């Protein structure tokens, strides 16, 4: 029978007519020739290349060429000593349209039915038996150079699939697949695997296998393909696709991992790629390779250095041991497959089994996409992934899925977990939790953190409620039964809040409800108990998340955490308690520093806007390098008429800011009552520019009753006078060539320029690029933020409300009439810096008086020129002192004490008191300079006779 079958096979082969296969043309991105010069070759390699080229020429694989295309060619020597010719086709591949793979993945030999006989064959020189399309041959030309160019180079082009061409594997699979299609149709009950040029045939009986193989030989030969006779396998053990196949078992082929070559990222990437390829056979869980996977972190440069750690060395040893001992099983085609899910450490592990026979392992990637992945979601993802794998292997869903959950937990998972619904969508099999009794799974390291045990999804009854908060200043805090503020090194509000939650979990060893205004922290705390934490390049974040997970898992009592929106106006105790926690970490000082860095607002403005002390506000200004250098000197006291209400009297001038370029003419207007400033940058200072500026002022400040300017031509022209008359505005000018008449606006010019310099050289704002934008920022600071001495509101508030809120307004005072040299009683209308406006009486015009010619009126008054008593004067002094302190005046306490001691001597005249005060001051100071320490000579001095620095000179 055997001889008869052999003769039948031979006759069948002899009768077959070989038809040349039809070539598959390539698609090109360009028809422009690609030419890469051939590099010189050593004499030995050049001789070998000539021999190989002649051999391929005789076989008809190449032909002479005059193609404008060229690719370099070279040879390598095999271990056997034979030479192999290769072509560098990288440049040509770049202009070929890819066909795409026909087999995205290797077939699994575990699907070969157990106990079926096998035959494995290898096609000989498969690429060289498949022709190229005629129009494509010239694209694969190469050149064999001559030494010293002593003769013309020899050029050839490929007529068959060249090795290294982008689409050669796809074309090869297509040709072999066509040849095997008749075999698959005729022997549909046989199991045939084809991968590139390796073919495996399995049949239920040997006779059927021989018949199938005989027919396969004929079809392969008919397609112009040849079987390598020395690579036919007919007995166990079979070697196929890196596996050793036996009648029932499948083992990985024995390999040795070379550790001495592992030096770069590329080396470790290749190693782990190979290990991952055989992991479904080896059964190495993800947690057992975590140190090897960790080596891949860091620099993405393939040549970046990497080092094999002792922990990773142990894991490689485990891989080698598994290669020696691991095995899987061939399946029974009539029995269903099952999926087992084990709750292993790090991430779950899946196993495909048939009865108790292991078919394949399934794992999740070591790194996840999300920062936190719940363990239940990982189980669902693994189920969905392995279901697709089983369908790919055998075309069917698993018959049963075994999970480490109770029936109630499975029911809750279907209700609450979206990932669970996706992973088990359309599954009609059995979901069970009873594992088969076998020892092959006992080595797995299991975890108990599958579902939350400590974290609750609903508020706890009869539990403490704690509110947490964190700030970007590094402070974390909680409030509840007790309050605590924690200083952290973090500059992130979320990280500080994370520290606050961790501290609460550590401090309260009892059931608690935590309320946080960070949704990010709340979600992280809810998930962290059973989550796989994704590795981050930020070590601080890794440490915080790991500490949070450890803290939660160590707790003995449950907790609930929820989110509350911060800074809302909602009523109720929760909002108030959250605000209390926010107050513990919010820093008005930091906000004040940030505003000053942006606008360079003065100390009074900072104190008014933020809850900071005078010292803190002054420290901010004093520590600012720009404000320290550009601090304006104290202006000498004097009188310049001012308005008694907003828009009563303006002063206007033009100053120059060279840095503004062609817009360097800055027109400035200041309201003399509120000190509200408005300025515009113009290209000149003519009447048209002045009118343009005033219209801008009207839009912001309103229309004034009176404007005072200098005698510039733009202000004295008839056109300007006509413009003012249209708006019903009266106009006055100062003394020509005397700037003192315009002292207020001149001072404003200096203030505005100084503010511009501060913000330009020391400001944090980078968006103020145009001159007008720079002006607007300076004006905003001066009008809406700064508060000046003797005032309690900003210039903008004074201008809009008409209220200055000076503490001396409405008070009775004595004022000195310099014409008559007498002291009169009046009432303060407004009080400014070094000046005051006094009402002498009914039906009399107000009088502007320097503050050195004023004193407070106190009842009873015996003599307007003499002090009433030491007690009265002391009371007056304390009143003024209190006001000075409010205005930020820094007094020398020792001098104050000296002058008070002199006043309290109860002498008959002020001169005698001054003499005593002067004497004490000299003795105390050890200084003989009478001008510096002499007390004020005016009885009832407005400064209490004790502040020569404020008086500057004798009040009389």
UniProtKB/Swiss-Prot annotation:
Keyword Protein biosynthesis: no
The keyword Calcium is annotated on this UniProt entry: no
Binding site for Zn(2+): 596, 600, 624, 627
Extent of motif LPQG: 161-164
Annotated Low complexity bias: 869-879
Chain sites annotated for binding Mg(2+) 1: 469, 497, 517
Coiled coil: none
Protein family (similarity comment): Belongs to the beta type-B retroviral polymerase family. HERV class-II K(HML-2) pol subfamily.
Sorted UniProt keywords: DNA integration, DNA recombination, DNA-binding, Endonuclease, ERV, Hydrolase, Metal-binding, Multifunctional enzyme, Nuclease, Nucleotidyltransferase, RNA-directed DNA polymerase, Transferase, Transposable element, Zinc, Zinc-finger
A GO BP annotation: DNA synthesis involved in DNA repair
Notes concerning its domains: The LPQG and YXDD motifs are catalytically important and conserved among many retroviruses.
Region feature (Disordered): 865-890
Residue intervals of every Integrase-type zinc finger in the record: 587-628
Primary role: Early post-infection, the reverse transcriptase converts the viral RNA genome into double-stranded viral DNA. The RNase H domain of the reverse transcriptase performs two functions. It degrades the RNA template and specifically removes the RNA primer from the RNA/DNA hybrid. Following nuclear import, the integrase catalyzes the insertion of the linear, double-stranded viral DNA into the host cell chromosome. Endogenous Pol proteins may have kept, lost or modified their original function during evolution.
Superkingdom of origin organism: Eukaryota
Pfam families linked to this entry: IN_DBD_C, Integrase_Zn, RNase_H, rve, RVT_1, RVT_thumb
Sequence ranges assigned to domain Reverse transcriptase in this UniProt record: 57-245
Catalytic activity: DNA(n) + a 2'-deoxyribonucleoside 5'-triphosphate = DNA(n+1) + diphosphate; Endonucleolytic cleavage to 5'-phosphomonoester
Domain Integrase catalytic: from-to ranges: 642-803
Underlying gene: ERVK-6
Protein name as annotated: Endogenous retrovirus group K member 6 Pol protein
Residues where Mg(2+) 2 binds: 469, 582
Note: This protein is synthesized as Gag-Pro and Gag-Pro-Pol polyprotein precursors. These polyproteins are thought, by similarity with type-B retroviruses, to be generated by -1 frameshifts occurring at the Gag-Pro and Pro-Pol genes boundaries.
Short sequence motif YXDD: positions: 195-198
DNA-binding region coordinates: 811-859
E.C. number(s) listed in UniProt: 2.7.7.49, 3.1.26.4
């Amino acid at each position: 029978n055997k001889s008869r079958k052999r003769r039948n096979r031979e006759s069948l082969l002899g009768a077959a007519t070989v038809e040349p296969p039809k070539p598959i043309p390539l698609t090109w991105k360009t028809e422009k020739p690609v030419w890469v010069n051939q590099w010189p070759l050593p004499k030995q390699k050049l001789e070998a290349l000539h021999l190989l080229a002649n051999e391929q020429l005789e076989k008809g694989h190449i032909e002479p060429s005059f193609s404008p295309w060229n690719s370099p060619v070279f040879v390598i020597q095999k271990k056997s000593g034979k030479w192999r010719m290769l072509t560098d086709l990288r440049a040509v591949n770049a202009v070929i349209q890819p066909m795409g793979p026909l087999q995205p993945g290797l077939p699994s030999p575990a699907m070969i039915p157990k106990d079926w006989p096998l035959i494995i064959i290898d096609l000989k020189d498969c690429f060289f038996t498949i022709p190229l399309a005629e129009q494509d041959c010239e694209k694969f030309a190469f050149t064999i150079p001559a030494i010293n160019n002593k003769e013309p180079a020899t050029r050839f082009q490929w007529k068959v699939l060249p090795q290294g061409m982008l689409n050669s594997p796809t074309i090869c699979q297509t040709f072999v697949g066509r040849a095997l299609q008749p075999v698959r149709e005729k022997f549909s009950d046989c199991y045939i695997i084809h991968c590139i040029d390796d073919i495996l045939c399995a049949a239920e009986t040997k006779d059927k296998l021989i018949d199938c193989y005989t027919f396969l030989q004929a079809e392969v030969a008919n397609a112009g393909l040849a079987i390598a006779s020395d690579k036919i396998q007919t007995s166990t053990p079979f070697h196929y696709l890196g596996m050793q196949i036996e009648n029932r078992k499948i083992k990985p082929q024995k390999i040795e991992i070379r550790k001495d070559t592992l030096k770069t990222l590329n080396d470790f990437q290749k190693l782990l790629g190979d290990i991952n390829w055989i992991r479904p056979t080896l059964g190495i869980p993800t947690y057992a390779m975590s140190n090897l996977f960790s080596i891949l972190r860091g620099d993405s440069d393939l040549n970046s250095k990497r080092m094999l750690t002792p922990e990773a060395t142990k894991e490689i040893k485990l891989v080698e041991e598994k290669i020696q001992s691991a095995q899987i099983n061939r399946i029974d085609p009539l029995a269903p497959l099952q999926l087992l899910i084990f709750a292993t450490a790090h991430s779950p592990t899946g196993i495909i089994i048939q009865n108790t026979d292991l078919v394949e392992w399934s794992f999740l990637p070591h790194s996840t996409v999300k920062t936190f992945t719940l363990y239940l979601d990982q189980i669902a993802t693994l189920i969905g992934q392995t279901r697709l794998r089983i369908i790919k292997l055998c075309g069917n869903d698993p018959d049963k899925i075994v999970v480490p959950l109770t029936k109630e937990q499975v029911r809750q998972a279907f209700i609450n977990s979206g990932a669970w619904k996706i992973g088990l969508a359309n599954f009609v099999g059995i979901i069970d939790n009873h594992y088969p009794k076998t020892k092959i799974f006992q080595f797995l390291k299991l975890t108990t953190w599958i579902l939350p045990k400590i974290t609750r999804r609903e508020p706890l009854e009869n539990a403490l409620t704690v509110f947490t908060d964190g700030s970007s200043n590094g402070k974390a805090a909680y409030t509840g039964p007790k309050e605590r503020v924690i200083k952290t090194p973090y500059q992130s509000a979320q990280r500080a809040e994370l520290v606050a939650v961790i501290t609460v979990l550590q401090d309260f060893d009892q059931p608690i409800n935590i309320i946080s205004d960070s949704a990010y922290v709340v979600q992280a705390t809810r998930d962290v108990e059973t989550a796989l934490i994704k590795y981050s390049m930020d070590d601080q974040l890794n440490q915080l998340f790991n500490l949070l997970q450890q803290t939660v898992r160590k707790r003995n009592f449950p907790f609930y955490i929820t989110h509350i929106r911060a800074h809302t106006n909602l009523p109720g105790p929760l909002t108030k308690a959250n605000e209390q926690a926010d107050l513990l970490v919010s820093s008005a000082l930091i906000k004040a520093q940030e505003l000053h860095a942006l606008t360079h607002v003065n100390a009074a403005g900072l104190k008014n806007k933020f809850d900071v002390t005078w010292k803190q506000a002054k420290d901010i200004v004093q520590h600012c390098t720009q404000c320290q250098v550009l601090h304006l000197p104290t202006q000498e006291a004097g009188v310049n008429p001012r308005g008694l209400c907003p828009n009563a009297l303006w002063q206007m001038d033009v100053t120059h800011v060279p840095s503004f370029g062609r817009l360097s003419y800055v027109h400035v207007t200041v309201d003399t009552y509120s000190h509200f400033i408005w300025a515009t940058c113009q290209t000149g200072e003519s009447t048209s520019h002045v009118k343009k500026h005033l219209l801008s002022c009207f839009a912001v400040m309103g229309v004034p009753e009176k404007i005072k300017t200098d005698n510039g031509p733009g202000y004295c022209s008839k056109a300007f006078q006509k413009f003012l008359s249209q708006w019903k505005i009266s106009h006055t000018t100062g003394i020509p060539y005397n700037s003192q008449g315009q002292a207020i606006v001149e001072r404003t010019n200096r203030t505005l320029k100084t503010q511009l310099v501060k913000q330009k050289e020391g400001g944090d704002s980078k968006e103020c690029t145009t001159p007008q934008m720079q002006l607007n920022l300076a004006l905003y600071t001066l009008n809406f933020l700064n508060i000046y001495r003797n005032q309690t509101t900003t210039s903008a508030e004074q201008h809009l409300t008409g209220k200055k809120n000076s503490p001396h307004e409405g008070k009775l005072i004595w004022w000195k009439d310099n014409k008559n040299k007498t002291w009169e009683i009046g009432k303060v209308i407004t009080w400014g810096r070094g000046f005051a406006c006094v009402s002498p009486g009914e039906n009399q015009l107000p009088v502007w008086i320097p503050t050195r010619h004023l004193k407070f009126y106190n009842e009873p008054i015996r003599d307007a020129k003499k002090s009433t008593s030491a007690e009265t004067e002391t009371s007056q002094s304390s009143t003024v002192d209190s006001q000075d302190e409010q205005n930020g005046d820094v007094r020398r306490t020792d001098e104050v004490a000296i002058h008070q001691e002199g006043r309290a001597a109860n002498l008959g005249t002020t001169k005698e008191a001054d003499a005593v005060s002067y004497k004490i001051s000299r003795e105390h100071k050890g200084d003989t300079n009478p001008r510096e320490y002499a007390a004020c000579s005016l009885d009832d001095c407005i400064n209490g006779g004790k502040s020569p620095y404020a008086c500057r000179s004798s009040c009389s």
